[in-house]
């Protein structure tokens, strides 16, 4: 997907809370919105090059949103609204192995008391529920999720197992929002409950997809699958 709004590279200064950050724009420090509640502490390091996007909402307190940052040569997207858009585009273009047959794509659909990112249907009306998780944590080519404990993420995995137990297709897709990665693993050290739930989901027949992205300062798209190590 191409970013419709104009972007700029600036210097990151600090992040006082989850939703706010400060960057240097035209030699002056300015407040920007951070559309990501994760820690991102390995990415948003004072002095790093950051990617900001121009915004034009009348009720906004800031002119820009901080949507990415460079870690070495890797540009990493941190806009939490982007992964579902990237995956939807990939589903439409049949780029996800194993999900090509699904022709109907619906966002934010429920199964029982659970809400998932996507509900897919094939021409025979067979259903498939897909949850998407954006991945930004990387070290020496190994990506991990989550970067902070996530009860919600664990709950999603257990709910996908319930979907599968009802003989309905279910999967989770980890979208690695950077290039130059070799493999993906659950972050046992940070959230052992999530790691255990992911392994249980795998053994229960829930599909686990891992894809990396092609990322630039004006676009991001799903590119290639990444090795899963459980």
Swiss-Prot record:
It comes from the Bacteria. Transmembrane segments: none annotated. Signal peptide: none annotated. InterPro entries: SfsA, SfsA_C, SfsA_N. One of its GO terms (molecular function) is DNA binding. Pfam families: SfsA, SfsA_N. Belongs to the SfsA family. This is Sugar fermentation stimulation protein homolog.
